[in-house]
Amino acid sequence: MADRLIVRGAREHNLKNVSLDLPRDSLIVFTGLSGSGKSSLAFDTIFAEGQRRYVESLSSYARQFLGQMDKPDVDFIEGLSPAVSIDQKSTSRNPRSTVGTITEVYDYLRLLFARIGKPHCPECGRPISRQSPQAIVDKVLELPEGSRFQVLSPLVRERKGEFVDLFADLQTKGYSRARVDGETVQLSNPPTLKKQEKHTIEVVVDRLTVKDSAKRRLTDSVETALGLSGGMVVLDFVDLPEDDPERERMYSEHLYCPYDDLSFEELEPRSFSFNSPFGACPDCSGIGTRMEVDAELIVPDEDKSLDEGAIHPWSHGHTKDYFGRLIGALADALGFRTDIPFAGLPLRARKALLYGHKTQVEVRYRNRYGRERRYTTAFEGAIPFVKRRHSEAESDASRERFEGYMREVPCPTCQGTRLKPLVLAVTVMGKSIAEVSAMSISDCADFLGELTLNARDKKIAERVLKEVNERLRFLVDVGLDYLSLNRAAGTLSGGEAQRIRLATQIGSGLVGVLYVLDEPSIGLHQRDNHRLIETLVRLRDMGNTLIVVEHDEDTIKVADWIVDIGPGAGEHGGKVVHSGSVKELLDNAESQTGLYLSGRKAIPLPDIRRPQDPSRRLTVHGARENNLQDIDVSFPLGVFTAVTGVSGSGKSTLVNDILYTHLARELNGARNVPGRHTRVDGDDLVDKVVHVDQSPIGRTPRSNPATYTGVFDHIRKLFAETTEAKVRGYLPGRFSFNVKGGRCENCAGDGTIKIEMNFLPDVYVPCEVCHGARYNRETLEVHYKGKSIADVLNMPIEEATDFFEAVPAISRHMKTLKDVGLGYVRLGQSATTLSGGEAQRVKLASELQRRSTGRTVYVLDEPTTGLHFEDISKLLTVLGGLVDKGNTVIVIEHNLDVIKTADWVVDMGPEGGAGGGLVVAEGTPEQVAGVPASHTGKFLRDVLGADRVSDAAPVTRPRKAAKTVAAKAAAKKTATKTVTGTAAKKATATRTAKTAVKKAAKPAAKKTTRTSKA
């Protein structure tokens, strides 16, 4: 097999006739500025061709079902393996998706429980089982020889009636005896039963003695009894005393509980699926949650008194006085005060206020003429009131208002397990499938590893357990051991979702495959990075080729081969600047990546941190959503704050689910319900909140930077204001390519026409009428400063910034797009061709161009996703500009370059999942670096340098920590001849990344030296 992957003449997107030779069975990292062409080469050329060739090998019939792959614009590629891609797609937001279903572990667990699970009765908890007639006979013949018994067929169990016809029918069939309510009777003289009482009737099929010669007769009798009763037989051992539990033995062909008279259908794997009607809880249809009124949202702040409006739905609007009088009447009736905090009220009073009061209360009030009036009325209670008004609401606005007091709570029927009671009563080693799914992945792996099974079950479960354990092991390896299998996919952070997909793909254990990965380190803390790198290295050692598009320093240093694409982005990129080893990259003066890695260029440390005003802060009190452990956290206003911590420590929950959602609700009137917390102080000091998250922008070909940021509306208005447009009577709508009027109708404003080729890829050709301009001839005759609307859409943003300089509404948008580093992107460039990093910056620009008031809070979730060192530098300049105007920027981030430039750091942890949810450290980066318990602090110490840490932290412990680092550095100095003294600190930090260390020590050293000097 070829030992190289050869690419010749790649011209996809902005690639400029790129030719490359890559080693196979290696870890290859593609790096370069955002938008330089890394993804175009890795995904749109190499992966697309590998995938297309595999699909081409199938029959034309199969191909038409598979979605066609476009042939990339490349001359040829040699040495290509079947390709698997793991890209930056957002996770499924489907409420039915869980970690277990995405990773397919749950599918194997369903199979395991269906085949070796022990069913129990959901009512009484006794084991239930089924037996064939032969198995029943074999069990009976194992009993002591000579035991006498009678074979009974239960026909009626605890049912009302006289059953005259049944007795007559049995007699005609030749049966002579029956047992009615425990008494044996002759059918020739049947008893007269009371119609209104419940009766049990069993017909005596045969009377036998245990001996081998009776085997055939016993089998016939058992089969007859099973046939009569529909699958049940009772054996009554007459020699045993009446009260002996062994006297009667009941056997069933089906799953049946004789004690509760419940019979159950066969257990199949689908019975354990909450996405199937056979297994889903009938009340919540397998979702596991229901919308219920939450008392915490009714009384958000228990420190307020009733007079101050503690009961939120009753403290607003024109009904405020009415409810005030009603509460006063209840206070008189129950004898409590309304001027003390709600938390201090007696339990009886709080219960009555929330859930209602049985007896009527007397309300007294003065009407507008000053006369006192009184009436008696029922006191409904705040929770029933919200429930009733929500169900009676006729308008969406009214319904949404009351939904603001409701929260998703676990379904009361299934307790949030999503499954039917019978399914939950099936156990393996005493645990139900719901209990196994609720364990953390590491506990689940231990539980399945310690299963003790009998020989039969072992043989059945062997293969299933092997598959499950493989998948679980891999999830543990990529640092997701704290997640549980029943965790909803929608609640995962970006990094968790990405690594779950990685685990799913790599768990298959294929060899000789080309894996193309897009930034697998997103959302991963430096502490966990080495585990991911070890996984990638192990995957390579199995005999696979890995192409990783990555900006992470550690990953770049471990790579066998680096391809740096650039030198700039967009039209200024698309060339291979470097293809070779890390060492050669560091010496390459043209490569931006090389300049940063070697330390010749660095993101500087700020000389001083912006001062904080203790009176101006946002403080979240009592945060306890997800894994947060009732914490109070402060965010100083007017500074740049970074929220850090290992993956799954509760950063997104605190910032996105609680702080941002609360501010959006208070300031923007949003309807979303914030996560559980007591209150937020300081929200009166800000007047606007803006959020930029990781979700992609609209991925339709009609969406582009101009339409997404809203600047296109201003451009269309400007064209409609030109003399020519006014003469022709054109309105702004004439200049839209999405509506009839000004667009070319041949291609409906797309500029291209899709030609369907059935089982070959669809071909897109430029429209022969407008030649790709999207507009009709008349519209294109309108010019502004000599350019038509199509010319403007085709302009790079940096050119458009100068072109529209005189129009403030447009130039503001253009300047922001240019500032975030998108000057090379064309205004009308389709959103589908933007890289992940570019799409996020378009989103950022559309938020940043809004006029800042100086009292705005910007919340950004991992803004460095997909960004190169150079791009991060530009981003920090933009964010710094916002803070200098008095605004507040809060970022959730793992990137040390961003954290070291922050004014304030809130470090969450100490671990992920149940081991997190606390604030480990808060303060300036220097102070956090001095906290031994902080994982982030440990890595910050190496970036900042020991001298800065000791200066900033007034506590003794940080000084001690700093001394230790300095001592280690000194010790290393003697051993390292080629590198300067401070270099060794980086080597100490990277020691954790076991595989990384050997290749990385020297380059790492250089970088740190320069950074600390800067």
Swiss-Prot record:
The gene is uvrA. The UvrABC repair system catalyzes the recognition and processing of DNA lesions. UvrA is an ATPase and a DNA-binding protein. A damage recognition complex composed of 2 UvrA and 2 UvrB subunits scans DNA for abnormalities. When the presence of a lesion has been verified by UvrB, the UvrA molecules dissociate. The lineage of its organism: Bacteria, Bacillati, Actinomycetota, Actinomycetes, Kitasatosporales. GO terms for biological process: nucleotide-excision repair; SOS response. Forms a heterotetramer with UvrB during the search for lesions. HAMAP family: UvrA. Its main location: cytoplasm. PROSITE patterns: ABC_TRANSPORTER_1, ABC_TRANSPORTER_2. A zinc finger (C4-type) spans 744-770. Residues 976-1014 are annotated as: Disordered. It comes from Streptomyces coelicolor (strain ATCC BAA-471 / A3(2) / M145). ATP binds at residues 32-39, 645-652. Pfam families: ABC_tran, UvrA_DNA-bind, UvrA_inter. This is UvrABC system protein A. Residues 996-1014 have a biased composition (Basic residues). Residues 314-592, 612-941 form the ABC transporter domain. Residues 976-995 have a biased composition (Low complexity). It is found in: Cytoplasm. InterPro entries: ABC_transporter-like_ATP-bd, ABC_transporter-like_CS, ATP_grasp_subdomain_1, P-loop_NTPase, UvrA, UvrA_DNA-bd, UvrA_inter. One of its GO terms (molecular function) is zinc ion binding. Keywords: ATP-binding, Cytoplasm, DNA damage, DNA excision, DNA repair, DNA-binding, Excision nuclease, Metal-binding, Nucleotide-binding, Repeat, SOS response, Zinc, Zinc-finger. GO terms for cellular component: cytoplasm; excinuclease repair complex. Belongs to the ABC transporter superfamily. UvrA family.
